[in-house]
C-alpha cells in the first residue's frame, strides 16, 4: 500500500527538505516570493502528469501559464493556475463528457490534494484547487480549470 505522505519515508523527507532549500535559494536569487516559486514547480509537476497520460493529445494548454511555460520570456510572471480545454475525439453526451473531465482532473492532480470549486463545476467544466499535502493550501494552491465552453486557442 503506497502512501503519498512524504513524512513516512526518511529518504522522501530528505528530498523534500533539499527541494525546499533549493527553491528558497532560487527565490532569493531571482527576487520572487518563495511561495510563487514552489507553486510554479508544482504546476510543472501537474503538467508532467498530464503529458505522461493518455489525455495529453486531447487537452489544449492555454492562458498565461501556457505562455510562460511554452514561450519563456513572452510574459514575465509566475503562475497560479492551469487552464485547459478538453477536445474529445468523438461526440459525447454530457454524462460521458463529465466523466472524461473528471479522469483528466484526477490524472493531473495525482499525488496532490484537491478541493472542488462546486460553483464552477458542471458537465462541461471542472474547477478545483490542487496543492501538495506537505504544503499549505493557502500559499501553494493551484487553480485547475478544465473545460470546453471557451475557445481552445491561447489568448
Residue map of PLM features:
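Compositionally biased terminal segments of proteins
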Residues: 1-155
